[in-house]
Each structure stands twice: as structure tokens, then as C-alpha cells.
């Protein structure tokens, strides 16, 4: 009986060789283990994008994974660039591989932000490869003698030729040529299979990917397609038969694999952040920051080229933003006034007398605690701070905290609103450093949710910044640390239903019309399995009659989840002590000025690599703008609503009953986190009365509590309709504040500790399983451990099942309590502004778009319902942004005068900011006396003048919109001379007067909003009397009453947790009506529900207390509605 030879596949591409490989890394690793390979080298083209995923699977399978990449190399062989596989033999070789991949994407000696290259243009010169050859093994799939000689000179015994047999014409000649060159030059020849798939069945999809890459169809691709499915993973037995004449080629492959001993586990937790140091004597003030580059340090004679920050430090000048009642009133933040003796005694003082590492962190925490608590902190806080600092020191995370502190310090020094959130708000250290705004000790938050020595993973601090000013913060990080040591985390954009259908359909040769009809059948995220014969028939397609349509659907399902391209993560930054490009390749992002690493956040987490999340939050921008507006337009001195300092959210008056009463009425359009349909339905039932109620409100409308069946029990208990009970008596201290119902991740962790005997570290591992995507199977596998632990404590039967069900719900994502509390601060601040300063709040929201749940026209209608006068855009009064003015158009409000909201020029669709600024610059010299004067002074072209006229922005100069448009058409194209002072060359036509509906339609088409009135008010007289109810009237109808409603569609939602139910919000002149469209109704009326801007809906009233919905039986487009470009916001 013969034994299969040892064999390792050295040349394997995954789907992260974008549009080349047709299998996921995990599929390749799993298949390699199944086939009994002794190792597998993942070598994607110009990247290490999929290596961490492969590594995670290889650990599970016990398969040696060789780290490699297939580089496109210029200058190795004659003609066009050649492919060269490089495999890492050791850590030094891995660093060199990352540098070479970075060089391929970024070019030589790149500084600043290198320009992005198309993937087909990415290449690295062979000279760079030769210079970085140490620790790398080169595998060349060619036979050119000169190229082989150059490889041998550069790599010596670490070079080999690769040969493959795919049963195609001409390949035997290539195999013989390679073997001949190898013998002649003393270079080994190894058998590989140039793997593109893990199974032969995936070859059809690989053909489609090839067509997508080349922009062709399978009918026209010709030789671009592989002639068969032989480029798949093969086992040793099959290869031994295929290469019976050359067994030494298989042995050579196994030998090369044995030489490549580097494993990804070697970089786990590697590279702490650069040290931050503060000069002795610089602790008492200033924010001056100085740092030396490695080159400068070398010139100064420094022995290390590791950059460090040498700061003159101060805490943020902003007091803590905490309207919660337990938050103390804070004094102004002091500087750090450390004595020289205390600094010198600390072991963290370096030889130059500067504070660094733990010494600096401890000193910052000491002074920060005095700042937060107005003196020495309470004993429980001091104990918690000491415990946290000891753990930070033992785990070596001081630089991480100091780096985040420095970034926050920079933002505050520039007047940028920011606030930490997420699990970091569980940390008292983060609170006293000014990173977060929630006092975790007073709120009883669980620190282990943030850092745990038991689980041994790095902390994760998320900081939100004003989204319009976040770029300043990002560029500060690049500048401070250098682009070779700082990069943004990537996000892998994958194929979804619609994009998969489009690409596959085009590749299979479907007509553009067929592709469009197919793509319109699904939303971007819908499961293609829902596309059945009925939907195909609606689109005029028949799968039974069209093999290509059937194949398109089948292949698109396979393609879903494949990587399509890289994007930028919402805010993750990796910052390292040694060059980042020695840990992970860097490449330019599509956005100018950004560079990204080739791994996403899950890859970094898998390897325990630190990242800092610097996120943009639109509400912080809106709050900053609103506070600035109030500072400029202060109410009268006698006003009962004081204006807070524009940089200090903490000075907003706390615990105002009027604010809670407003939120309890679901009057929350524009308010952070509580403006969705679900939150507005919850509000009348929850009736928030204090800050902690807002914390619960933020957390409860989440997939975790919804899927765990926790919302209704909590509300019933809150209303006294259900007795508060605990499935296990010792859980009462954990669940008492939420009436026996777990709503937060921290509660789920404590529940596992108390009810099942988990250690805190095990409980956090459970939390990780619960919140990780694809976690349901893992959580179900832990049920035995949970049930056994509960049984030991006498919990069984229904109680045990209830606890497990609640835990299982958190696999659908639940909020940590600290995160909900951080967001609740912004809920309160935005609600206070809406309640007492609706004009400033609405103005700030308009100027911060795009953000939030509603389009500008809904924000304007809501402002009008709150008594705000809104005036339209006008070249004589509007700024670029929307603004506040007084009773006199274009002039500030006088003391005691109500502010009026003026829509800005930015609202005009398609109008460039440069054109708007030119108008404002010209107007600064004096008001415009006529349209002709406007054109002359602002140098407006005909196109922009016409756009202004269409938008009604010439109202103060030409009140009649149609006449203004007519006159604007007479302007010379270059904005120069006018015909007879804007009179047309022929007598002006007698234009009919525009109707009110025409005016509103024109407003929506050009600006997306109208200040003249709601379109429904214009069409209601034609709807047939009182038969069609207004949104306001719905509240007076009894439960299950038949009803018809009509309105403008402002929001469509189809949440994953709703099991196919679609929620539609209709707006009319009185408010908003919420429609519930069940799956069967949606399927019958899908095109109307998804596409009609105005709807007429018939159904029945559904009442639950003060919450009123309409359960829809049928819908139709509203025929009488004016034709306008009204855009709803769709959420899937």
C-alpha cells in the first residue's frame, strides 16, 4: 500500500485577490485540512487582506499557514511585469513583505498621502524586491533564464521555480523549460497548482469574476477564461498521480513550506503605541506639543528612532458634560501642577527628567480627579482609580490611554466638541482624563466590560467628534505620529444582493433592462433567496424560460459576501511604535489625504492589536452649531432659558421636567437617538422622568432586547401591570434598576457570573460571543455550560430557559450601559435645545446635513409646528448656510425679539459653494439693486442665475419666479453683457401666474423643502371631503377603526428584526402617521411602497395606549399629489 507524499500548496489565491480568487480564505484552509495537506500558503495579489481570516481558521484546523503575497514585479523579466510569490520565513521576512506590498501601492519613499493607484497599475520594481529579500522565499512561475539568474543572485538558496499542470495545451513545454533552467542554474523546482478555488464547482463563479474584472461577458471573454476547473485545491494523492514523473517537485514544495516558519501568532499584541512624555516643569499649563521625527532624532544623536511626544500638558478646559443628577458641578479645569519631588520619585521619570508612561498617566489622573470632583475624590472613586491604574500598568496600556488623552486634548484646544463612548465610559480613568463624560462609579458601571486581565485583549476607546471637523483630528494624528506609523483601519465592502445581481447579470450577458429589473426586485441588503417566480414574473422575467436568469440568481447568491473593494472604517486608527508598514501593509484610500491598512477591525481584534476609534458624530456638529448660534443671538436678559457656554454641554440645565414631558409626547424629531418611529412609539409608554430613563430609552430599542423579548415585560412592569420578578433571587441587585429585565451587556455579564458561576473573564468572553457577527451558533454551543452552572445553583426548568433566552437575545446586539449613558447625555442636550431654542436647533440641524433620521423638509415642517417662522432662500438675505435673523429680513434679531430661521443658499441643489461665496462677497459691498446688478457684481453665469431663479432665490429682486426664470435665460452665457438690462430680445411673454402647487413643487425640486406650506394642504380639498383622515385625527379614532390616510413618504424602514414588516412614515400638514405594512401586503404592493413619493393607504387603526399606527390593507400612489422631487430616507 503506497503512502501519499507530503505536500504543501504554495500558490493560493482567495477572494481577496479581488475578482481573481473565487473562494473565501476560510474555505481554502478548511479544504486544505480536509485534503491532508502539510501546509498552505495564502498568497493574494499585492495584499495580505485575507491572511488574518485564514490564520484564525488555520488555528482551528491545526494547519500550518504560510504567509505570502503574489507581487506584480516590474523589471524582473522582459516585457510586461511578472508575478512573483514571496513567502515569509521569519518575522524579519514578514516585515519585509509588508514593506514591499506597501511600496507597491504607495510608491518609493512616500510621504504625505500618496495618490491612489488602480489595482491593475500596482507594481513594485525588482530592485526594491532584491533590496528587501532578507527573510523571504521567492517562488517564480516562469522559466526565463535571465530572470531566474537575477532571482538567484538576490535570494540565493531562498528561490525556486513554480510549475503547474492544468491539462492545457503548451504547458508541458513550460514545465520542461522550467526544470531545465532550474538544473542549469541550481534553482529548485516546486510543484504548485496556482489555486483559485477550493472546489471545482466554484469555477463558474471564477469565470464570472474574470468577466467582471475585464468588463466583458462569458460569451466574449475567450482566452481570458480558464479552459477548465483544474486550478483548484488538490490533495497529495491526486497530485502524486499527476506528477508521477516528477515526485521531487512535490517534495520541494513540502521542503519550502518547512523553511517558512513564521506564523501570524508572532505579532499578536505587538507594537504598543509610541510613548507620550511631558517635560518636567511643563505640567502647569499650555498645550504646546513638540515631536521629533526619526530622522531628526538621528541627527540629534538619539540612539532610538522611536518617535515620542514631548508635551506641555493641560487637561481640557471643558467641564464634564453630564446633565445626570449624580454628576457634580465641576470647577474650571486646572492645569497639572505636579511638584518636581513627586515627579522624580516616580519610576516613570526618564533620565531627562520628563514624565512618561505610567508616571505621566498617574499624575494626569491625580489632577483630573481633583478637576472632576472639585478636590480630592471620594474614597470609592479613589479605590477604583487605583485598581484601574494598577491593571493598566500590569498590562502595559499606559501609552494607549495617553495617546487618546492627547488626541482629545488637541480637539478641545481647537474648540471641537468631543465625547468618549462605548465601553470606555466604564472607566474612571477615562472619566477623570476628560475622555468620557459619565461617572462610572456613581452609575455603578462594570469596569471589566472595558478591560479584563483574564481575557487578555486590548481595550477599545471610541471618541466621537463633530463630524464636519473630524478631519482636523485625523490629520493631527497623521502629522503627529507619521504616516508610516499611523493608518486608518479599512472596511471590507462586500457584495450585497443588488450589486451581486448587477455584476453577475452583466457578465452572463443579460440585457441592461433585464439587469435593472432584477436589481430592482431587491433592496441592497435583501436575501436573494426571497426572489422567487412570483417576483420574477412581476419584473417580466421567467426563470423557467431563461437559463441565464436562473444562473444569475444562483451565482449572485454565491457572490454575496465576497469582498468588492476596500473603504475606510468609520474611525479606527492603528498607531504603532515601530513602522506600521512592518506589521500590516498600508495603501492609499479612495479619499484624498487618507491612508489605510489592509485589515479591518475584526482582523485587528483577532491579533489583539490596539486601535483608537476617532468617530464623526453629526449630532455633536449640530450641538456645536446650535450653541454658537445662541451665543450670537442671545435671548433677552429676562429669558428663563439661560444660554449655555458654547463650548460646554455640561452647563445645560439638568433634569428639566419640561424636557422630559416633551420627550414623553414623542415630540422628538431631530433629537439624537430618539427620533425614529420605534423610539417615538416607545416614548408615550416609557414617559421618561429622569436621566436614567433616557439611558434605558437609548438601549431598549436594539435588536438584543427586542429578540430577547425584553421590551414588553419591562414596559408592563414599569406601568405596574406585571409583577417584578427575578428568575434567581441573588440577581435582584443586578436587575433591580431595570425591573428584573436585563437590558444592558453589563447585566448579561453579571447574570452569567451570579446565575451560572462564570468568572468575570468568562462572562466577558460570553459577551464577545454574543456581540460578534455569526455568533448565534457559538452562543448555542455554550448553552450546556450555562445550564450546568445554573443547575448547580438550583436554577432549572422555565427559569433557566428564561435566563438563556434573555442571553441569547444579546447575540443580536445589545448596548453596554456605559454607551447608552454617553448617548443619553446627547439625547438630553439636543432635547433641551429643541424645547427652549427650536429656531437655533432647527437651523443647526439644517446646517449639519446629512445626518439624522429625517430630510430637511421634515425638519422645517417640525420647526414651523413649534412656532418658528421659516423664510425661504434669497440672494438678498441668505448666507451660505441657514441662519437666524430678526423681524427685518437679513438683519439680526433685536434683544427680546423672536429669532426667524432663514434658509441658506446651501439648500439649492447643485449650487457650488464657490458660487454662493461669490454672491456673499459681492453683497458685502452693499445690497443688490436689481438682477442685473447681481449678475454684474457676482459675475454669475446664465446657468447659475437660472438655478437661483428656479429656486425662488431672486425674490427680493424679482418677486415673480416664472418671470425671473424667463429673464435669467436672456443672460449671456459668460455672465457678462445683458440684453437690454435683462429684457429679452423679444417682448416678454405673458406668463400665466404659478399656482401654489406649482410653487411648492418648484421649491421641492430645487431645494428639497418648501417654506410656503405642506403639499398635502394643497391637495387635500381634492381628496373627497373628510374620508381621508389627517395624522392629527388618527389619535381620536378607536382601535381597529377602518381608516384612510394620505401623505408624503418621509421614511421607509425594513429592520432585520421585524421579520419582513415594513414601516412607512407619512407626513401631512398636521404631523406624521405611521404605517405598518405586513409582509403579504408588502409583496402585493412592493413597487408602490418602495417607489411612490405620496401614498394613499387604507387599513385599520392599531392603538396601544397613546401609540397609534395604521395597519395597512392596501396602498396606492396618490394621484392628486403634485409632481415633485421629494426624497424619502430609506433604512434597511
UniProtKB/Swiss-Prot annotation:
Known catalytic reactions: DNA(n) + a 2'-deoxyribonucleoside 5'-triphosphate = DNA(n+1) + diphosphate
Q: Name one GO molecular function term.
A: nucleic acid binding
Q: Which Gene3D superfamilies match?
A: 1.10.150.870, Bacterial DNA polymerase III alpha subunit, thumb domain, Metal-dependent hydrolases
Give the UniProt keywords, A-Z: Cytoplasm, DNA damage, DNA repair, DNA replication, DNA-directed DNA polymerase, Nucleotidyltransferase, Transferase
Where does this chain mainly localize?
Answer: cytoplasm
| Keyword Transport included in the entry's annotation | no
Per UniProt, subcellular location reads as:
Cytoplasm
| PANTHER family from the UniProt entry | DNA POLYMERASE III SUBUNIT ALPHA (PTHR32294), ERROR-PRONE DNA POLYMERASE (PTHR32294:SF4)
Q: What is the recorded function of this protein according to its Swiss-Prot or TrEMBL entry?
A: DNA polymerase involved in damage-induced mutagenesis and translesion synthesis (TLS). It is not the major replicative DNA polymerase.
Which named protein is this? Error-prone DNA polymerase
Q: Which organism is it from?
A: Anaeromyxobacter dehalogenans (strain 2CP-C)
Phylogenetic classification of the source organism: Bacteria, Pseudomonadati, Myxococcota, Myxococcia, Myxococcales
Q: Which gene encodes it?
A: dnaE2
